[in-house]
Amino acid sequence: MAVVLDLLNKDTRPKLDAPARPRHPEKAHRPDTAIQRKPDWIRVKAPGSKLWAETKDIVRANNLVTVCEEAGCPNIGECWEKRHATFMIMGDTCTRACSFCNVRTGLPAALDEAEPEKVAEAVAKLGLHHVVVTSVDRDDLKDGGAEHFSRTIAAIRRASPGTTVEILTPDFLRKPGALEVVVAAKPDVFNHNMETVPGKYVTVRPGARYFHSVRLLQRVKELDPTIFTKSGIMVGLGEERNEVVQLMDDLRSAEVDFLTIGQYLQPTRKHHEVVRFVPPDEFKAYETTAYAKGFLLVSATPLTRSSHHAGEDFARLKAARLAKLGPAPVAASIRAVNA
């Protein structure tokens, strides 16, 4: 597979005659694994519409990074055609090296202090009613980037008061007080992905700790029960069904509201192999099980991704909570948090 060049930062864009900087130098020693042909149920239309191009132009004009591009999301054509984009703050270089992820690994640059305003400007230009903001892991920062998340949320609120904000955060491992800073900024949805079952963490997500991530999501609810919490996993990495069901129980013990389950797709030959393409009927079975365990909302399809249909899902989340609790308890919770 061709090395993908960084085309997002005008100041660091490689020259045509310069050697490409490897995205994943830490994976160079790994043996190649064959990339399997995708089954028919995972085919998507290539992007290229006028609205897709307009969204790309706005992203470029504000010198922003999107996880849609960096992670090689298969839904980019559909989402950008709807002028939906998931902004990835704090640069395009991650301090961790998860075996499933296509985001560049290395030593990140200093934070762009103007980035929160740039994101807010792009949100306003795109006319987004709901925006998703994620980030690379920044273990090099004292607070893991918590203050940068907080400033970005605040900037969006100022520029687009009617826009709801969903964040997809790293785990802030060994960053005391970081989570509290982010929650105090009052995002509407707090998403932190578990990514896989605990038995696969050593090979899939080696820099993270499974129960730390569960506790992170639980702590969000303790700090502010009005914030919706969300988490997602990939399947097809060699997990067993009983492991996925146990993960559901762990997330429900943390009062997580929304679960997403999607098929893992291998970015390059150096990444973790796809052990299995899970058929659609098994995703439907996972969805049924998750609803039975009490999640307010479940999205489980081969092409499900954390930010896919996020705006529509937020409306469904609100409706589901209202139907479950009724208007009086919801209003009381909001008053208690704001007191």
Curated annotation (Swiss-Prot):
Keywords: 4Fe-4S, Cytoplasm, Iron, Iron-sulfur, Metal-binding, S-adenosyl-L-methionine, Transferase. Belongs to the radical SAM superfamily. Lipoyl synthase family. Residues 13-35 are annotated as: Disordered. [4Fe-4S] cluster 2 binds at C94, C98, C101. It is found in: Cytoplasm. It comes from Methylorubrum extorquens (strain CM4 / NCIMB 13688). Binds 2 [4Fe-4S] clusters per subunit. One cluster is coordinated with 3 cysteines and an exchangeable S-adenosyl-L-methionine. The keyword Cytoplasm applies. Its cofactor is [4Fe-4S] cluster. It is an enzyme of class 2 (transferase). PROSITE patterns: RADICAL_SAM. Its EC number is 2.8.1.8. InterPro entries: Aldolase_TIM, Elp3/MiaA/NifB-like_rSAM, Lipoyl_synth, rSAM. It holds the Pfam family Radical_SAM. This is Lipoyl synthase. The gene is lipA. Residues 80-296 form the Radical SAM core domain. Pathway: Protein modification; protein lipoylation via endogenous pathway; protein N(6)-(lipoyl)lysine from octanoyl-[acyl-carrier-protein]: step 2/2. [4Fe-4S] cluster 1 binds at C68, C73, C79, S307. It catalyses: [[Fe-S] cluster scaffold protein carrying a second [4Fe-4S](2+) cluster] + N(6)-octanoyl-L-lysyl-[protein] + 2 oxidized [2Fe-2S]-[ferredoxin] + 2 S-adenosyl-L-methionine + 4 H(+) = [[Fe-S] cluster scaffold protein] + N(6)-[(R)-dihydrolipoyl]-L-lysyl-[protein] + 4 Fe(3+) + 2 hydrogen sulfide + 2 5'-deoxyadenosine + 2 L-methionine + 2 reduced [2Fe-2S]-[ferredoxin]. One of its GO terms (cellular component) is cytoplasm.
